[in-house]
From Swiss-Prot:
The keyword Lipid biosynthesis does not apply. The gene is recR. PANTHER family: RECOMBINATION PROTEIN RECR. A zinc finger (C4-type) spans 58-73. Keywords: DNA damage, DNA recombination, DNA repair, Metal-binding, Zinc, Zinc-finger. This is Recombination protein RecR. Residues 81-175 form the Toprim domain. NCBIfam families: recR. Belongs to the RecR family. Gene3D superfamilies: 3.30.60.80, 3.40.1360.10, 6.10.250.240, RecR Domain 1. May play a role in DNA repair. It seems to be involved in an RecBC-independent recombinational process of DNA repair. It may act with RecF and RecO. InterPro entries: DNA_Rcmb_RecR, Rcmb_RecR, Rcmb_RecR_Znf, TOPRIM_dom, TOPRIM_RecR.
Length: 198
């Protein structure tokens, strides 16, 4: 893109690194930002820097937080005997929109994927097992219905079985190969209601 100054090309390149942002979208975002008033651009940049500097992972569940433990883990009104296992922090946001689940969460930060060289030791399964105490009665596995999500669900079921914890899987309704983030609230609610033992 030799017709753009180097600074614009660099900004387009950086935006294009974001998920679901192609070259055209990156170009549109860049041009939009360049047309904003300087104070709005500075506010945007400061918000990015502040979020990156203050947001961390909850030491209990692995969710994004600015306090430790996070607001969900430290909420006395949450059910402590049920944990919903998800792949990423964004999945907690999706589940919370449904307003059907009042337990705790556990974020794996990935799935088991031998093809990508990712085994159980590379995601937060050890931390999940460590959370199994006399209080936890059920673990709902809400990984995405992909090959990796299913493999991860089966592994979790196998590893928790000796610990006398009921392990369930969210029900059909989420399409195979789908992503929880894109499921509507009714579908996700029905999937939670119809979960099955694995």
């Amino acid at each position: 893109m030799e017709f753009y100054p180097v600074a614009i090309e660099k900004l387009i390149e950086e935006f294009a690194k974001l998920p679901s942002i192609g070259k055209k979208s990156a170009q549109r975002l860049t041009l939009h930002i360049l047309n904003l008033p300087k104070d709005e651009v500075e506010e945007f940049a400061n918000a990015l820097v502040k979020a990156r500097g203050t947001i961390k992972y909850c030491s209990v569940c692995g969710n994004f937080t600015d306090t430790d433990p996070c607001a969900i883990c430290s909420n006395p009104n949450r059910e402590k005997d049920i944990i919903c296992v998800v792949e990423q922090p964004k999945d907690i946001m999706t589940m919370e929109k449904v307003k059907e689940f009042n337990g705790l969460y556990h974020v794996l930060h990935g799935t088991i994927s031998p093809m990508q060289g990712r085994g159980p030791q590379d995601i937060r399964i050890r931390e999940l097992v460590a959370r199994m105490s006399g209080d936890v009665k059920e673990v709902i596995v809400a990984t995405n219905p992909t090959i990796e999500g299913e493999a991860t669900a089966m592994y979790i079921s196998k590893i928790l079985k000796p610990l006398d914890v009921k392990v369930t899987r969210i029900a059909a309704g989420i399409p195979v190969g789908g992503d929880l983030e894109y499921a509507d609230e009714v579908t996700l609610s029905k999937a939670l209601e119809g979960r099955t033992v694995i």
